[in-house]
Amino acid sequence: MNSKNTIVYVKVKGKRPDGFVDPPVFEWNIQKEKKLWSLLSQLNDPDKEIDWALLAEGLDAPIYFLKRRCYELFTKHFELLRQQIDRKNKNALTDRSETPERDSTEEITKEVNFLNQLPVRTPGTIQEEFNEDNGPKDKNKTPDTTKKAIEQLKSSRILNFKGNKLDYNNREVGLTRYDSTYEKEGVHTEETESELSSSLGVSKSTLEEALMDKLQI
C-alpha cells in the first residue's frame, strides 16, 4: 500500500450536488491489467482514437478508471524501456574501454617474452667479446711470431756487433774499436763510420716495421 496504488475516498457530510451519481462498483485484477496493455501496445496508427466506451464495456470498468490506468501503464513501460537503453549504452562503453587495455596487455606480454629469450650478457662476456674483436686474430700463433722476431733481432747486425755505437757513455771507446777493426782490414775510418751509420739506420727502421708486422700491432 502506497500513494501510487491507493485511493482514499472521503465522505463529506452535506447535500449532494445535482446530477451526482455514485461511481459504479467494479472489480479490477491482474488479468484485466494485462488485457488492457495488450490492446494498447497493438495500436500502430497514432491518428486512430481509442473507443473508450467499447473498451470500458469489454473490461467492465468505468472510462475514467481506464484512462488513468492507460496513463500509468505507458509511464511504467517507458521507464523500463529507458532503463534498458541506458544499460545497453553502459555495457557498450565498458566493452570499448576494456578492448584497448586488453590489446596493450598482450603487446607488453609479447615484448617481455621476446626479451626473456635474448641471451644474457654479463660484464665477463662483454669483455671477452671486446678482446676477440680488438685482439690478435690468431692467438695461437702470437708466441711463435714473437719468438721468431726476437731471434731475428738477436741475429741482426745490431745485436751481434762487437762495438756498441748506441752507448754514448763509451762513444770514444767504441769508435776506437771500430777504427782498429777496420784499420786491420784496410778500410778507411771515415768511410766506415758513414756506411755503418746508414746501415744501422736502415736496419733499425726495417726491423721495427718487421717486428710490428709480426706482432700485428
UniProtKB/Swiss-Prot annotation:
The keyword Transport applies. Residues 134-147 have a biased composition (Basic and acidic residues). GO terms for biological process: autophagy of mitochondrion; cellular response to nitrogen starvation; piecemeal microautophagy of the nucleus; protein localization to phagophore assembly site; protein transport. The keyword Transport applies. Its main location: other. GO terms for molecular function: SNARE binding. It is found in: Preautophagosomal structure. InterPro entries: ATG29, Atg29_N, ATG29_sf. GO terms for cellular component: Atg1/ULK1 kinase complex; phagophore assembly site. Keywords: Autophagy, Protein transport, Transport. Residues 126-147, 184-203 are annotated as: Disordered. Plays a role in autophagy. Functions at the preautophagosomal structure (PAS) in order to form normal autophagosomes under starvation conditions. Also plays a role in mitophagy and regulation of filamentous growth. Belongs to the ATG29 family. This is Autophagy-related protein 29.
